[in-house]
C-alpha cells in the first residue's frame, strides 16, 4: 500500500527528501499530541529511510526541549544517504538505553528500526534493539511510538508500541487479528 503511494508521489515530482521531511513533521505532531511535556527521546535507528523519518522528528522535537538519545544498529556511515544526511552530533549515542538515567518527564522511544519493506524474522541485532525497547516500556514506563508499523510486526520480538503513527493511511496489517498487542493506538498522519 505505502510503496504505491510513494511511487505516485515520486511520479508527481515529489522528492524522497521532501517525503521524509513531511513524514518526520507528521511524527512530531503525533508526539506533541500524546506527550505535551518535553522529556527524553530515544530514537532507535536502522539504516533505511525509517531512520531518516525518526531523525527529522527528533531534530524538531529537540527544539521543543526534548533531550535526544540514539540507539543505532549500524554506524551512521552505513546508513542510506538520505537518513545519514540528517544524523548529527546533537544525537547522544548510547550503548544501552536501559542503563541511561533520564531527566524528569516522559521517556519516549521512537521506533525507526524497520520500515514498510520488512518481512520475515528480524536479524539478531535488530531483534535485540526491539527487545530493549520492550524492556524499557515494561520495566521503566517508557512509551513507544512506532512509525507506520511497529518494527518486526508479525515476527518474534516485535516492538510493542503504545502509539503507531501511520503516514498517509492506516495499513491493513495494523488491523489484522492479533496485531493490537504490537500496534497500540493508531494515529493518522495526513
Q: Predicted regions span which residues?
A:
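Nucleotide and nucleotide-moiety/phosphate-recognizing core
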Residues: 28-115, 121-147
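Positively charged, low-complexity intrinsically disordered leader regions
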Residues: 1-37
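General N-terminal targeting signals
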Residues: 14, 19, 85-87, 176, ...
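Residue-level detector of flexible, active-site-proximal loop/helix-junction positions
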Residues: 9, 75, 100-101, 151, ...
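YjeF_N-associated NAD(P)HX repair module
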Residues: 3-4, 105-190
Amino acid at each position: 500500500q505505502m510503496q504505491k503511494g510513494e511511487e505516485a508521489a515520486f511520479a508527481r515530482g515529489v522528492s524522497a527528501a521532501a517525503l521524509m521531511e513531511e513524514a518526520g513533521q507528521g511524527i512530531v505532531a503525533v508526539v506533541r499530541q500524546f506527550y505535551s511535556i518535553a522529556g527524553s527521546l530515544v530514537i532507535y535507528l536502522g539504516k533505511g529511510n525509517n531512520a531518516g523519518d525518526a531523525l527529522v522528528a527528533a531534530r524538531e522535537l529537540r527544539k521543543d526541549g526534548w533531550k535526544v538519545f540514539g540507539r543505532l544498529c549500524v554506524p551512521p556511515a552505513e546508513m542510506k544517504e538520505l537518513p545519514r544526511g540528517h544524523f548529527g552530533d546533537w544525537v547522544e549515542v548510547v550503548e544501552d538505553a536501559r542503563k541511561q538515567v533520564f531527566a524528569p518527564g516522559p521517556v519516549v522511544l521512537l521506533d525507526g528500526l524497520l520500515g514498510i519493506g520488512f518481512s520475515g524474522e528480524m536479524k539478531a541485532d535488530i531483534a535485540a534493539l526491539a527487545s530493549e525497547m520492550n524492556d524499557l516500556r515494561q520495566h521503566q514506563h517508557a512509551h513507544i511510538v512506532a512509525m507506520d508499523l511497529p518494527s518486526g510486526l508479525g515476527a518474534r520480538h516485535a516492538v510493542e508500541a503504545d502509539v503507531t503513527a501511520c503516514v498517509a493511511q492506516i495499513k491493513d496489517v495494523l488491523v489484522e487479528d492479533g496485531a493490537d498487542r504490537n500496534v497500540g493506538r493508531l494515529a493518522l498522519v495526513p
